[in-house]
UniProtKB/Swiss-Prot annotation:
Presence of the UniProt keyword Cell membrane in the record: yes
Protein known as: Uncharacterized protein Rv1342c
Family: To M.leprae ML1176.
The organism of origin for this protein: Mycobacterium tuberculosis (strain ATCC 25618 / H37Rv)
Pfam families associated with the record: DUF3817
Amino acid sequence: MTAPETPAAQHAEPAIAVERIRTALLGYRIMAWTTGLWLIALCYEIVVRYVVKVDNPPTWIGVVHGWVYFTYLLLTLNLAVKVRWPLGKTAGVLLAGTIPLLGIVVEHFQTKEIKARFGL
C-alpha cells in the first residue's frame, strides 16, 4: 500500500506548472515583439523594392523574418498547450503574427489574461 502524499508534495506540482507557464509566456512575449518588428522591416523592404524601386534592396530581411516567425509559431504553440487554449484561439493568436503590429496588441491582451488567470 502506498503512503498518502505529504502536503508539500501536493503543492509542488502546481508551483512547477506555474513556473513553466511563466517561462512559456516570457518566450511568447519576446517572440511576439520580435516578430512584429521584423514584419515591419519586411514591409519596409517590400516598399523599397516595389514602390521606390531601389536597385538591390536588402533580401535577407525576408529570410530572417521567416525564421523569427517560425520560432514565434513554436513558442506560441508551447504556451497554448500549457495554458490549454482552445484550437480557435490558438489559431487566432498564431495568425495575429502575420499582420503588422497586431501580434503586439494580441500579446498585450493575452499576457494580461494569462497573468490574471494563473496569478503570475
